[in-house]
């Protein structure tokens, strides 16, 4: 009888959480990241993706793609973690053992589905998605197959907000025509090597002989990919060991011989390690930089923060402060950035501008959202730095008369707040003096308004 592994992937998770808790953003292109335009996109709504914007893209590029209707909001990881915890509690309740892959995706293998028909699995998956939607308000895509590899591919095919199943008997029909890059373990280097051999699809790889695999990809990795392509995947669904550290390093084909080249490499590694940190869902207290010189000497330096952070600017600034340069140590061949001291508890930075590499002057901003009857939206968000009194772009705020809201505009001594949560529908806008004593900073989690 067939086993059924289910992969659940929350759709555009960070952006969906923002649209859930800030109803005015629903249906609009939303980018999650630094409102100033520096750094990279942490999340993009499907409305933004239709313009070509995506996660890990430079923010300035994504903003140019989505145009004037786009809205950029600062990330609120406390909200994402709370939503993630609720989703995974549902998966455990309905599916049993959960293998968490990241903050927004995981596997289950419900015992009740062993030997079930595709129709029965579809009914179960529909029920799971309905429970997730009912208890969190968030969309989820579900994929199912005879192993984790196929289930993961199927959830990608199900997006957005759908279900896609592939029974073992359908493997050749549904999987073989897909690009070989869909397989786990086939990165750019392996894909290029396979293309040189004329291997473009999963089916092309599956039809290769064992000897061809051994010669072209090796007996270990090659045979593993070959078996996955053929649909053989008996890996069990089991809880993963909690990572103690996250690290990214790159070896460069040409030695780095300038300070600028080293800084660029550190920024690249910082962004990639930060992306993995977001997937993990925790914050890091220690930032490390690893350098390997042209003569193979290795030097590692680290710094420990007084708090766990998941702020990209903080990670990058700390890594740059740890840098050593070619005029000090000679040509550099490898650059890596590591994050450790991972903790669930995370502290928001009171003065994030102190951690930035490049100081910027305070400027006015206005987040480009408006009441539903407005036909044109304009975004001129240029700086998320706090004002002298401490307000920041898209910050959560509380007012005793109007409740929970978020900063939509700030400048010339005035602050504009839109008051809304998950349950209110699009909220009304109110403008106050920035020093209004009735305004106070709010816990972002309260925007979820879960009882």
Swiss-Prot record:
Pfam families with a match to the protein in the record: IMS, IMS_C, IMS_HHH_1
Gene3D superfamilies associated with the record: 3.30.70.270, 3.40.1170.60, 5' to 3' exonuclease, C-terminal subdomain (1.10.150.20), DNA polymerase, Y-family, little finger domain (3.30.1490.100)
Keyword annotations from UniProtKB, A to Z: Cytoplasm, DNA damage, DNA repair, DNA replication, DNA-binding, DNA-directed DNA polymerase, Magnesium, Metal-binding, Mutator protein, Nucleotidyltransferase, Transferase
Residues at the active site: 105
Superkingdom: Bacteria
A single Gene Ontology CC term: cytosol
PROSITE patterns: UMUC (PS50173)
EC assignment: 2.7.7.7
Domain UmuC positions: 5-187
Catalytic activity annotation: DNA(n) + a 2'-deoxyribonucleoside 5'-triphosphate = DNA(n+1) + diphosphate
Coiled coil: none
Oligomer status and interactors: Monomer.
Similarity section: Belongs to the DNA polymerase type-Y family.
Function according to Swiss-Prot or TrEMBL: Poorly processive, error-prone DNA polymerase involved in untargeted mutagenesis. Copies undamaged DNA at stalled replication forks, which arise in vivo from mismatched or misaligned primer ends. These misaligned primers can be extended by PolIV. Exhibits no 3'-5' exonuclease (proofreading) activity. May be involved in translesional synthesis, in conjunction with the beta clamp from PolIII.
Name recorded for this polypeptide: DNA polymerase IV
